Every structure is written in C-alpha cells, then in structure tokens.
Amino acid sequence: MGETFHNLKKLARELNLHTVCESAHCPNIGECWNHKTATFMMLGNLCTRRCGFCAVPKGKPEPIDHEEPSRVAYAVAQLGLKHAVITSVNRDDNNLGAAQAFVNVIAEIRRQSPGTQVEVLTPDFQGVPEARRMVVAARPEILNHNIETVPRLYRVAKSGGRYERSLEFLAEAKRESSAHELGPIVTKTGIIVGMGEEMHELLGVFRDLADRKVDILTIGQYLRPSRDHLPMSRFYTPDEFAFLKHEAQQMGFRHVESGPLVRSSYHAHEQAQSTGLA
C-alpha cells in the first residue's frame, strides 16, 4: 500500500470518519486510495436496514453528528482528492436530517476544497420528496443512487427498498435538475450480479434505467461478505460482463463500467471525465 493509502487511513481515524471502502470490505481499496479517490460514509457506521448483500452492520444509529460534513471536507482538502464520493448508511429514522447532511457536505467541500468534484451516493430517503429535492438543489457533480438488483430479488437482497421507488428517485432527480440554468445533473446507478438474477431480468433493469435518462451505470460481481449474507449464485465470466456492457451502451448510457471488481466508486473520476465533467 502506498503513502496516500496510509495517510488517508490515518486521517480518517483522527477525524472519526468512516469510509465505505473499509466498512463494505471493498476489494479495490488500495487502488482507489492510492489514486486519490475515496468514498466517505457519513451518518454513522450502523444502518437502519439489513440488505442481504451488504457488509455494513445494522443497528440503532447514534444521533446525527452535525460537525461531520466539515470534518469530511477537511479530510478531502488535506488529502488533495480530485474526486470525492460521499455516501451514507440508511437513516430511516431521520430522512430529512440525512439529506441535510449531504447538502452540508457538498457546501463544505466546495468551501474547503474548491477544486474537488463531488459525487454523492445517497439512500432513497424512503421516497420522501423533500429529502431528494434538497440534495438535487445542492448540485453535486454526480448524483448516484444504486438500484442494486432486479425487482424480483428486492425482498431478499434489498430489505426496506423498493424497485419502483429507486427508479422514481433517479427519474425525478434528472427532471428536477433539468430546470436549473446549469442543466441536468449527471445521474448514476449501480447493480450487483450473482445474487440469483437472470440475464433477461438485468436487461430489463437496464431498459428501465435508460428510460429514466440515467447517465452512468456500474455493473459488478457480488462477493458474499460472510456466511450470514445472501449466497452467491454464480460468478459471471469476462465475456458476460462484456456482453452486459455492450447491451447497456446500446441503450444509450453515457458511460458503463462492467467487471467483477467494479463497485459504485470504482474509477469514479474517469467516469466523470467520460461524461465531460473533467
């Protein structure tokens, strides 16, 4: 691991910050951190949901730390990150408070590190329209909300989520931001394969996302975090990942990242470049 990796880890500990890179056991942590791309996870390290694929623990979260956005921005500035990805656990106990934390961290990063692009990966806020509107109005460079899986598997894989609600989130974010003088925000989503879905179901999800004008799609392999999590149904071949990428590109996505180790934030800066943001 390089110097940037160790500096980021040390700073996160000093500032009492979490990274999804560590909490979700991401396989790309060394590569991303050494290339000055990191994903900070706000609003605690306990999630109010228990998704079947996710390594982040479920529990009763602490009250929202209103100083956290400033500390995240400080870390971004100190590390000289060119592309910062900010996500959070689900906070079904306080959706508007969670949305406000995203608004605040976007503003703080722009104040403390004005050269950094901001990508936010948000929950669905249980479909609360005002929460979504708050984040859209803050104008992150990229607004990401992960669809995660096919509709049939939501009950076992994405407990607490609803497929149609996630589609609506992405569609409304694009529609609402289009009225701004700067034009629509770049929207992004990700899906995990290998949880029991069929190929035709994946292509159906891609069509639903393309119909809602999503710009960036990431496709990665599910890797079971523990025996307590959803079993992996199978490992997709390189040819299958290439096929999925080709099919998605044909549907009109501006950028598709597809491969076994692809995660939401993998090559995030390069994805921004491909859409003309950098």
Predicted regions and their residues:
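Auxiliary Fe-S-binding modules of radical SAM enzymes
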Residues: M1-T39, S70-Y74, N104-G115, A137-A138, ...
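A secondary-structure boundary/capping signal
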Residues: E22, M42-L43, T87, L121, ...
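Nucleotide phosphate-binding site architecture
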Residues: P27, T48, P151
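Canonical Radical SAM [4Fe-4S] cluster-binding loop centered on the CxxxCxxC motif
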Residues: E31-E68
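Short, surface-exposed acidic/glycine-rich loop or hinge patches that mediate macromolecular interfaces
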Residues: N45, P123-Q126, G196
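Conserved functional loop/turn residues at catalytic and ligand-binding sites
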Residues: L46, R50, A55, G80, ...
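Glycine/Thr-rich phosphate-binding loops of Rossmann-like dinucleotide-binding domains
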Residues: R50, N94, L153, R227, ...
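Core AdoMet radical
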Residues: A55-R71, Q78-E130, V135-A171, K188-T189, ...
